[in-house]
Design a protein with these regions (language model features):
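Phosphate/nucleotide-binding beta-alpha loop and adjacent structural elements of enzyme active sites
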Residues: 1-153
Length: 153
């Protein structure tokens, strides 16, 4: 329960700053958007917010975490196309580290020697009774350029 609450608080704080960004963008480009790319879809927080601020024809949501699509497909979103890949500078395969605390999933291995990471681990250890574990996943990376060329955009 504490874990769930902590994750939700983190998302609320993130959404607060995202709302300011989306408000600024809407004033700059207007409400209608043809294509929106959500790189790092996670559980759709940014996409949900974007759908509230804009009238979006298509959302292409990239998420390399193999566990996320299972959750996503339970929702009904007819303008969202989930791409179970990461985005990078070149098409390749790369190691993606997933954790039991999903907001810290990353392509970068956790540097347990850094002061920042040690502080994070202390905070998370206080909140979670379980140890933060990483799992390696070999995932596909695509460039946005190549993705768009395949889709003929």
């Amino acid at each position: 329960m504490l874990r769930y609450l902590f994750e939700k608080i983190m998302l609320i704080l993130d959404n607060y700053s995202q709302k300011k960004n989306f408000s600024f963008l809407r004033n700059l480009i207007g409400k209608k958007v043809e294509i929106f790319f959500d790189v790092g879809f996670h559980e759709g927080e940014t996409t949900s917010l974007a759908n509230k601020y804009f009238s979006i024809k298509e959302i292409h949501a990239f998420e390399p975490n193999p566990d996320i699509p299972k959750k996503f497909y339970k929702r009904k979103n007819n303008n969202i196309f989930l791409v179970n890949k990461g985005v990078g500078r070149k098409d390749c395969k790369k190691t993606f580290f997933t954790n039991n605390f999903s907001p810290i999933n990353s392509f970068f291995r956790v540097n347990k020697r850094s002061k920042h990471t040690r502080l994070k681990i202390k905070i998370l250890s206080f909140i979670y009774s379980e140890k933060i574990n990483s799992r390696r996943n070999n995932v596909e990376i695509v460039t946005l350029k190549n993705y768009c060329l395949k889709k003929k955009y």
